[in-house]
């Protein structure tokens, strides 16, 4: 049994060894066959790679030649479009220059008319003021003449009254002197008569003296009352004359005051009337100047809006040309486009295109900056700024500025141009890089 098993095991081992030998032979044969096929495939692949490399070099040369032709065509088209834009810009500049020159001439005419109107108004005002001054001087001279006449009349009246009063005083003094002499005579007579009476009284009796005294007293009192009555009449006449003089002087003063009040009232009415007329004329001239100024501002606004519209259309066409150039260029030319020479060429072209539309009086740099910002509110902001600028420079033209302000504005404009050119180049190469 054990021998059978051992024999069986030996047989199995021999069978497996025979199978292994046969399998190794087949593997070697398959390996040789596959190695040969791989060598044949490598040869064919090497041949195909050589053919592919030749084809690629030939296609690359053809592509470079086509690219150069395409670039030449693009340069020619850009030059033609640049020339067309330059011609259009020149025509637009000539048109705008003519409109600006006509507006400047019209503004000069309006300024000349305004100056003539101002001079005419000043001349009329000067004539009216001169007339008013002459009228006032004439009135003042008339018042002074009236016052002098009144004062002369018053002086003569006072002089006459004083003379009459002096005459009356002299008469009164003379009368008083005569009365004193008469009184002295009467006193002497009375003294003599009194002496005689005393002598008589000494000689006569008491009853006779009393009777004589009763007869003497009434006649003596009458003689003493006579000068008193004359003096009272003289004083009454003096008082009456003084009252009449004061009354006439008061009437003359009232007349002169009334005349002065009337003259002042007339002068005030004439002055107020003249002021009203001057104010009305001034308002009429201001309204006329305002209407003419509004018309000028409206014309300037229309011209500026039309110019800005043309400039925006030109900017849009420039953008379209840039986009068209970017879309036509193939992706394999990106490195060539980013080279320094082409950048300088594009920069020069953009600078030439934008220098065509540069006009300082229309503030075109601000307009290009607004066009570069792709936003919905760009046109509204630009129109509002233009309107604000137009209403800042109303009737009369632009005022002269100093040299320092002009230099600062020139420097700011140059810096804005540099920033704008850099932004345009960045946008162009950014579009080309995104498309590639």
Swiss-Prot record:
One of its GO terms (cellular component) is extracellular region. It comes from the Eukaryota. Residues 404-415 have a biased composition (Basic and acidic residues). Residues 371-419 are annotated as: Disordered. Transmembrane segments: none annotated. Residues 1-20 form the signal peptide. This is Uncharacterized skeletal organic matrix protein 6.
